[in-house]
């Protein structure tokens, strides 16, 4: 299971400005990033931030994105931050994307003993009853080792937890990446055998203008 929360997308204005630098075509930009409204209480006109991508800018974005990474450098300037809670087996694959990503994670090494282990700490939704029984045996053993470590501070028990911990254990990370990285992930993973990757790619499609800019070209699956 994967959960994605607190998504923030920013950098559109700089990305569009930079995208138009090579042809000095700033005057053709039809996007705007603030709008005015009349404040009746203060009897004044005020501006508020907003993001509206114009049709001409969007058309150019789509064209440059299709032309490849060199022409689509503007995608690196559209930044995305979010919190992701996912099992360790998914993070192992996510970590193959080193360029253009930053992540701060909840530390397994430092905090593995901080709380009692429960079934909800793991991705188990596809397990049958027998496998759930096995996982619960592992959880009971993890909690025994945790209690022994808390009581004795003997590193032997900490080692037991670290080496016994299943890869279905869920970890939270706060992640920053950009549309170019997401585009690469999307086309490589959208048909992946892991449900977490398919859910991640479905989330990509909900990002502003992602389907138009990044989602309409072919991609090879590594499933």
Regions found by a protein language model. Name each.
Residues 1-223:
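Family-specific signature for flavin-dependent thymidylate synthase
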